[in-house]
């Protein structure tokens, strides 16, 4: 066979084929059939291009004799046969000058008349099988495929054969001649049988035995064997006319594909109704801390000791009174509960030795606030299955709420920097591998950007409260334990600081299942007057409990100090996730890292340092009614972190549904922006699925309003 190849083909073609095989580590002397196949393919590519020119008028003409006077341009650019680097250079320059989409794999030719790349195939098997393999391999709508066989058959994309009859006849004749020459030397059978399919990564996986029988049984109707089903699936053109495909499906499926244009999408409908209220477990921007610097008191680190020490830093306590009642609650009970906390803290101080934990007396006000004896009595099903009118409680539909401005303010605050650091730079050992080195550099840069962020304070506060509450729920199931809400940080000067936000009193907590609820009463300090945005504090009873002297530019001013009290509840699973809120740092770091990776792959070097240190560059942060908001890389880090933290603090079924459903619409809009001409069916159904999640949750409503801003700007 090797001798035949050297005799039958032009020496230049033989040389190119040898070079190509060596590039892939193959030996022409051993893999002789492959050698012959490569030479054949090369020759057909050259023949395809031969004699085809474009004249001054841009018309395609055929010139067989070399007329030296004609100013002619070759119609085809030959890419096959060049070394890879050169071939890609040619492809890139064609794409740059013509604006044609760059193919993923190297094609064989470029046609300057039709402005498209061409993939030439020469097969010893059936043309349509080989065509499908090629199409599956290159997966590009834009590259034109033209297959020839040694038996004179051909197949091309959309039956558009590019060349005139005569030129194609020359190619078919040459292939027929090669086949006869091989046959006369007894080489054809071996050559014909040696052709493998297009080698894609997915090698055919043979199924035998029981699995094979199951596969044959579970074929869709009208398929006789797994093979012909496979062939059908391989040939299923996903971007072909979808209506045609649907008609092959079931008679029940009817979907009209509507083009999705700039004018198609409408904004999401946000609900009307009273303004939405705060529903997080802890207060955020309105929280006030009583703090001690450089704590060194006896029992430092024991929450109760720390709390008492923090309480003693404040001297403005006064007789508490209700300034904003809770609409549905028994407000005097909230007032009595706070007075009880003060009294019991005073009792502790009068004792010889302060205990490590404090269980509150089970007074009537606490029993009421913690829902003691309020749960309906559980009855065994056996005892009541004969009751004729046994039914589940009618539950009310949730009341719709409209978006209030406070939630955007909460988010803005969460992105801001505080004057304290809330996380330590983790002391992790020496890096062993270079990738670890890059990772720790990135981590250090990221930590520097977010360690002082208010969202990071919320993480540490959330972790502390959930851990303390879960511990107490397990350790003191029957007790009304008093749990201080504490956080720790470092000041600018590096001094340690312990902060008290208020207290929680836990109810009975026999938590068997993950979703069993433990009730608690939270009491949180604040300087925010609840009468400014009463709708935000709907679920709270607010007391005025003291006056605080604040240093301002004009000297000291006295401000009333408030206590926000409410009944709340949580479960084991929610506390478990709350304890793991530090994951938010990881999630936002990974998002930043993918931005760095994208930059690095464009520049072909690690861009970590430039990414964080180029202070002049701004990055898109999000969309507001004003347009696309931009900011420094630090601001991007903090915004991503705040989003992740709010997803945790405001986790809810409404958020789950909204995120999943709105993502689909987002992908369609992005496809439109990328000029991919998306089509949709039942867009109304998608809008319904998104909008049924827009009920009353402040964080979901804010995200929906951001989504509307995005739609407006994306479709301009």
Curated annotation (Swiss-Prot):
Q: Does the keyword Iron-sulfur apply?
A: no
**Cofactor field:** Mn(2+)
| Full protein name | Polymerase acidic protein
PTM annotation:
Phosphorylated on serines and threonines by host kinases, including human casein kinase II.
Q: Where is this motif: Nuclear localization signal 2 (NLS2)?
A: 184-247
Primary role:
Plays an essential role in viral RNA transcription and replication by forming the heterotrimeric polymerase complex together with PB1 and PB2 subunits. The complex transcribes viral mRNAs by using a unique mechanism called cap-snatching. It consists in the hijacking and cleavage of host capped pre-mRNAs. These short capped RNAs are then used as primers for viral mRNAs. The PB2 subunit is responsible for the binding of the 5' cap of cellular pre-mRNAs which are subsequently cleaved after 10-13 nucleotides by the PA subunit that carries the endonuclease activity.
**Enzyme class (EC, first level):** hydrolase
Q: Which InterPro entries match?
A: INFV_PA, PA/PA-X, PA/PA-X_sf
A single GO CC term for this protein reads: host cell cytoplasm
One Gene Ontology term of the molecular function aspect: metal ion binding
**Description of how the protein assembles with itself and partners:** Influenza RNA polymerase is composed of three subunits: PB1, PB2 and PA. Interacts (via C-terminus) with PB1 (via N-terminus).
Subcellular location per UniProt equals: Host cytoplasm; Host nucleus
Q: What is its EC number?
A: 3.1.-.-
Binding residues for Mn(2+) 1:
41, 108, 119-120
Encoding gene (name): PA
Q: How is the cofactor bound?
A: Binds 2 manganese ions per subunit.
Record motif Nuclear localization signal 1 (NLS1), residues: 124-139
Q: Which residues bind Mn(2+) 2?
A: 80, 108
Q: Would you identify the family this protein belongs to, as annotated?
A: Belongs to the influenza viruses PA family.
Asked if Nuclease is a keyword of the record, the answer is yes
Which biological process annotations from GO are given for this protein?
Answer: cap snatching; DNA-templated transcription; symbiont-mediated suppression of host gene expression; symbiont-mediated suppression of host mRNA transcription via inhibition of RNA polymerase II activity; viral RNA genome replication; viral translational frameshifting
Keywords, A to Z?
A: Cap snatching, Endonuclease, Eukaryotic host gene expression shutoff by virus, Eukaryotic host transcription shutoff by virus, Host cytoplasm, Host gene expression shutoff by virus, Host nucleus, Host-virus interaction, Hydrolase, Inhibition of host RNA polymerase II by virus, Manganese, Metal-binding, Nuclease, Phosphoprotein
> From what superkingdom does this record's organism come?
Viruses
């Amino acid at each position: 066979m090797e001798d035949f190849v050297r005799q039958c083909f032009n020496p230049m073609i033989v040389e190119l084929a040898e070079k190509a095989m060596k590039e892939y580590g193959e030996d022409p002397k051993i893999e002789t059939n492959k050698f012959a196949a490569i030479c054949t393919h090369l020759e057909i590519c050259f023949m395809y291009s031969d004699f085809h020119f474009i004249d001054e008028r841009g018309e395609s003409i055929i010139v067989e004799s070399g007329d030296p006077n004609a100013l002619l341009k070759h119609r085809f650019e030959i890419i096959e046969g060049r070394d890879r680097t050169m071939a890609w250079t040619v492809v890139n320059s064609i794409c740059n000058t013509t604006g044609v989409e760059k193919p993923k794999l190297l094609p064989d030719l470029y046609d300057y008349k039709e402005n498209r790349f061409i993939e030439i195939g020469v097969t010893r098997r059936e043309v349509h099988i080989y065509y499908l393999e090629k199409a599956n391999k290159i997966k590009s709508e834009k590259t034109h495929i033209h297959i020839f066989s040694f038996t004179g058959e051909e197949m091309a994309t959309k039956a558009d054969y590019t060349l005139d009859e005569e030129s194609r006849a020359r190619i078919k004749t040459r292939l027929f001649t090669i086949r006869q020459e091989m046959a006369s030397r007894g080489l054809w059978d071996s050559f014909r049988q040696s052709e493998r399919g297009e080698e894609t990564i997915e090698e055919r996986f043979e199924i035998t035995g029981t699995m094979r029988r199951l596969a044959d049984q579970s074929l869709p109707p009208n398929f006789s064997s797994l093979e012909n089903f496979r062939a059908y699936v391989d040939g299923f053109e996903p971007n072909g006319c979808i209506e045609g495909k649907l008609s092959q499906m079931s008679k029940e499926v009817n979907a009209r594909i509507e083009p999705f244009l700039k004018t198609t999408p409408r904004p999401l409908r946000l609900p009307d109704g009273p303004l939405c209220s705060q529903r997080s477990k802890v207060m955020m921007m309105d929280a006030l801390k009583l703090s001690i610097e450089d704590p060194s008191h006896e029992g430092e680190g024991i929450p109760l000791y720390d709390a008492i020490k923090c309480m003693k830093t404040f001297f403005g306590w006064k007789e508490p009174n209700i300034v904003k009642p809770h609409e549905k609650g028994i407000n005097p009970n909230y007032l009595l509960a706070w007075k009880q906390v003060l009294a019991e803290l005073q009792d502790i101080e009068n004792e010889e030795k302060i205990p490590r934990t404090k269980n509150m007396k089970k007074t009537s006000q606490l029993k009421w606030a913690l829902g003691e004896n309020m749960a309906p009595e559980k009855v065994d099903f056996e005892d009541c299955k004969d009751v004729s009118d046994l039914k589940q409680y009618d539950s009310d539909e949730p009341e719709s709420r409209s978006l209030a401005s406070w939630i955007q303010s909460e988010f803005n605050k969460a992105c801001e920097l505080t004057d304290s650091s809330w996380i330590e730079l983790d002391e992790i050992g020496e890096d062993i591998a270079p990738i670890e080195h890059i990772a720790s550099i990135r981590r250090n840069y990221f930590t520097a950007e977010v360690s002082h962020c208010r969202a990071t304070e919320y993480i540490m506060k959330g972790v502390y409260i959930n851990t303390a509450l879960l511990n107490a729920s397990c350790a003191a199931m029957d007790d009304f334990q008093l749990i201080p809400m504490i956080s720790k940080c470092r000041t600018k000067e590096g001094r340690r600081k312990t902060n008290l936000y208020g207290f929680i009193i836990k109810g009975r907590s026999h938590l068997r299942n993950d979703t069993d609820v433990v009730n608690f009463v939270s009491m949180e300090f604040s300087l925010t007057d609840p009468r400014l945005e009463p709708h935000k504090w709907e679920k709270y009873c607010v007391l005025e409990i003291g006056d605080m002297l604040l240093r301002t530019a004009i000297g000291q001013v006295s401000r009333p100090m408030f206590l926000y009290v409410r009944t709340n509840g949580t479960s084991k699973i929610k506390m478990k996730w709350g304890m793991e809120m530090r994951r938010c740092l990881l999630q936002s770091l990974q998002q930043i890292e993918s931005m760095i990776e994208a930059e690095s792959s464009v520049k072909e070097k690690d861009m970590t340092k430039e990414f964080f240190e180029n202070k002049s560059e701004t990055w898109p942060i999000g969309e507001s009614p004003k347009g696309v908001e931009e900011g420094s890389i630090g601001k991007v880090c903090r915004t991503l972190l705040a989003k992740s933290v709010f997803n945790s603090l405001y986790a809810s079924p409404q958020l789950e549904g909204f995120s999943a459903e709105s993502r689909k619409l987002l992908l369609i809009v992005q496809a439109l922006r990328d000029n991919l001409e998306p089509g949709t069916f039942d867009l109304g159904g998608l809008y319904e699925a998104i909008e049924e999640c827009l009920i009353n949750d402040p964080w979901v409503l804010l995200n929906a309003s951001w989504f509307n801003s995005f739609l407006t700007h994306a479709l301009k």
